Regions:
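Short, well-ordered loop/turn and helix-capping segments at boundaries between secondary-structure elements
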Residues: 17-20, 25, 45-52, 155, ...
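Composition- and surface-driven signal marking solvent-exposed, interaction-prone regions
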Residues: 2-3, 19-21, 30-39, 134, ...
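Membrane-embedded alpha-helical segments of integral membrane proteins
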Residues: 1-51
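Generic beta-strand/beta-sheet core signal
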Residues: 5-9, 26, 36, 114-116, ...
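The AdoMet/dcAdoMet-binding core of the Class I SAM-like
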Residues: 125-126, 136, 140-285, 289-292
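Soluble small-group transferase modules, centered on the S-adenosyl donor enzyme superfamily
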Residues: 56-157, 162-164, 203, 219-226, ...
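Active-site-proximal structural scaffolding
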Residues: 1-4, 12, 16, 35-39, ...
Length: 403
């Protein structure tokens, strides 16, 4: 009998582990799924209770009936408590982003799309939309920064044919890469996020209607591991905050090695690295540098972050390639959405910081971030103070464009 009960418990655990994330939560939500589970347990308890009802004392009977009645009254009032809690956290953090446009509960996270409330402060905010995952403000609608994540590395590839974007976000990098007329894959672990683009993007057909674009719901690292072909450009934008558990898996030396393995001989990798935590940034940059023999670093257009480009071959920006790209109407239209008139030589020189020589002088003695040393995920133990990182002036150099 004990073995039979143990077998039933194991079967129930397995079935519950499959049913909850893939059926119950997507169909009826987290709160209702909990209620269903509790209801099943109560039903079993009542069956057992009825078997001994005849021999129960009056106090026990009235107490049981009272508890059932109380639960019947209170349970319906708590069906939306999880949703309400997430909304409360979000509104406190960003008061002007209080209009909820979408709420999706998935197998591994809850995703909410917010929009500004129309106040003067909100209208002045460039980030009109914001996606929060489990109440964490991970994705903002910032076109300038995210468009550079596609255009900047593609400018450094002589004749690109195929690109990969890891992390869909608001879809801006994916859309921008498609304007180059190449095949573009995008991989995101969260199946709810790409669908939200149909709400927040001004022209969703550019994202979902381009035959050269392909959206894959999969972990970016696993996708790289199993990718059937090589790419001329791979760009990765880890969703902030960078110390989120598991995010080190797409910022480690081993991950960057996978990126390198899936690049063509002259392919370029691009990683957007936030420089808000001194020590964490250097470890991530060291992991990138340990893989790529050639590295270029550019300032982020708006944030305290860097666009880091890496390749197995020397990275060169040519005037001919720049002119070729800027002659494409779709590219110019895409840049115009972010208020950028042109990716001129002057702009590239302004954003440029240094190459691998400057990086090497900075990283002396710095241990790279690796899978078995995920130091990004232990920020609390190292203190919560944010120490902004910046490159020393003596590592800055001038960007030389070839003809």
């Amino acid at each position: 009998q004990l073995g039979g009960f143990y077998a039933l418990n194991t079967i129930g655990t397995v079935l519950g582990g499959v049913a909850a994330p893939f059926f119950l939560i997507p169909l009826i939500g987290t709160a209702m799924s909990v209620m269903v589970a509790v209801g099943l347990q109560l039903a079993v308890a009542l069956l057992l209770l009825l078997q001994g009802w005849a021999g129960a004392t009056p106090r026990f009977r009235f107490g049981t009936l009272g508890a059932i009645a109380l639960a019947a009254v209170l349970v319906p009032t708590q069906l939306d408590v999880y949703h309400q809690a997430l909304t409360t956290i979000s509104v406190k953090r960003y008061p002007h982003l209080s209009v909820e446009r979408a709420y999706v509960e998935g197998p591994d996270s809850t995703v909410v799309l917010y929009e500004t409330d129309g106040t003067p402060q909100a209208k002045a905010d460039a980030n009109r939309f914001r996606i929060q995952v489990n109440a964490s403000p991970e994705v903002a609608f910032d076109t300038y920064e995210t468009k550079l994540m596609a255009h900047l590395p593609l400018l450094a590839v002589p004749d690109p044919k195929r690109a990969l974007v890891i992390c869909f976000g608001m879809g801006n990098t994916f859309r921008s890469a498609l304007t180059h007329g190449i095949d573009v894959d995008v991989a995101d672990i969260n199946g709810a996020i790409p669908g939200l683009a149909k709400i927040h993007q001004p022209d969703p057909s550019r994202t979902f209607g381009d035959p050269k674009g392909r959206i894959v719901i999969n972990d970016g690292r696993n996708f790289l591991l199993l990718a059937p072909h090589r790419y001329d450009m791979i760009t990765i934008d880890p969703a902030p905050p960078v110390w989120t558990v598991g995010l080190g898996n797409i910022q480690s030396k081993e991950f960057y090695q996978l990126m390198s393995d899936r690049l063509t001989d002259e392919g370029v990798a691009e990683a957007w690295m936030v420089a808000g935590i001194k020590g964490d940034f250097e470890a991530t940059l060291a992991a990138f540098r340990a893989v790529f023999p050639h590295v270029l670093v550019f300032w982020g257009a708006k944030y305290h972050a860097f666009h880091v480009l890496g390749s197995r071959a020397p990275i060169r920006f040519s005037k001919a390639r720049l002119a070729q790209v800027l002659s494409q109407p779709r590219v110019m239209e895409d840049l115009g959405e972010a208020g950028v008139k042109s990716l001129s030589e002057t702009l590239l020189e302004k954003l440029y910081v240094t190459d691998e020589r400057g990086v090497d002088s900075l990283l002396k003695g710095v241990e790279p971030l690796t899978d078995d040393r995920p130091i990004l995920e232990y920020r609390v133990s190292r203190g919560l103070e944010i120490k902004w990182f910046t490159f020393p002036k003596d590592v800055y150099s001038k960007l030389e464009l070839v003809p």
